[in-house]
Regions:
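Divalent metal-dependent hydrolysis catalytic cores, especially in the metallo-beta-lactamase
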Residues: 1-6
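Aromatic- and histidine-enriched alpha-helix N-cap/loop-to-helix transition segments
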Residues: 8, 95-99, 245, 249-252
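Alpha-helical recognition segments enriched in aromatics with Gly/Pro capping
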Residues: 10-221
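Helix-loop elements that line ligand-binding/catalytic pockets
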Residues: 198-200, 204-208, 212-260
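Single conserved hydrophobic/aromatic residue that forms the stacking wall/gate
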Residues: 261-270
């Protein structure tokens, strides 16, 4: 139920940066504070990028005052037009990686169980979060001492195209809900594995609607049947979902149940 705002955790961010400087993982230069990437040997483990790939794929600015091209900003100076806070390095603001690490530590404690995000955030954002967190209060030799599990979701496209306001193809849940029940919308979204992309089209939502209706039909026809009446080869939903939250696999099994429902006895469906 916590929805932290970055501006409410500036002291925690400054505290994190000070600790990194004291432990020689970061340095101050021209009003900036930067994390020195070569000091953290596990950098790149999450994204599985080598040194050259890290530099090529990094979004960080290559400034002349950096000790290393891969070094990223923890704190940067603010102009009069930009938001800023007093700090040991002058008036400035935190880098966005710093914000996430500080708020996670303060609100959840370390380590926390699951860290989610889009797959585009694996590098450099999540890689940087791990580095600065493991070099402070978490364990430097154990990347999972910050977050135990990382879940990166794919993107939703529309009929093969990127969903974007500029293309005018944005579909809002509230609009879908005018024609489809929430269960149908959720099932449609779960039809693709969370790590993969989902191409949204009418076929996806129609298939989900059809499956939901069929499952309710089966349920209504099985009312009054006790557990002992049911097939011993029950659907093991938990085991399927334990396999990296394999929702498409579970939906496949639900479809198989619907096929079995056409057998002479509805009991055979379970």
């Amino acid at each position: 139920d916590i929805q932290p705002k970055a501006t409410e955790y500036i002291p925690e961010m400054i505290e994190l940066i000070v600790e990194l400087i004291e432990k020689d993982f970061a340095y101050e230069k021209e009003g900036h504070v930067l994390f020195h990437v070569p000091t953290y040997q596990n950098y790149g483990k999450l994204s599985k990028r080598n040194r050259d790939e890290q530099i090529a794929g990094s979004r960080v600015e290559v400034a002349p005052f950096k000790k290393d091209p891969a070094d990223f900003v923890l704190w940067k100076p603010s102009t009069d037009e930009q938001p800023g806070w007093e700090s040991p390095w002058g008036v400035g603001r935190p880098g966005w990686h710093t914000e996430c690490s500080a708020m996670s530590k303060k609100t959840l404690g370390l380590p926390f169980d699951i860290h989610g995000g889009g797959r585009d955030l694996i590098f450099p954002h999540h890689e940087n979060e791990i580095a600065q967190s493991c070099c402070t209060s978490a364990s430097i030799d154990e990347p999972d001492s910050y977050a135990k599990y990382w879940m990166h979701n794919g993107f939703v496209t529309i009929n093969g195209e990127k969903m974007a306001k500029s293309l005018g193809n944005i579909i809002l849940v509230k609009d879908l809900a005018e024609n489809y029940h929430g269960e149908v919308i959720r099932l449609a979204l779960l039809s693709s594995h969370y790590r993969q992309g989902l191409d949204w089209n009418e076929k996806v939502i129609h298939q989900a609607n059809k499956l939901i209706n069929k499952l309710y039909e089966i349920k209504d026809n099985l009312d009054g049947i006790t557990i002992s009446d049911k097939n011993e080869n029950n659907l093991d939903a938990i085991s399927i979902l334990m396999d990296d939250l394999n929702t498409p696999g579970l939906i496949t099994e639900l479809n198989n149940i619907c096929l079995l429902y056409t057998s002479p006895s509805p009991r055979d469906a379970l």
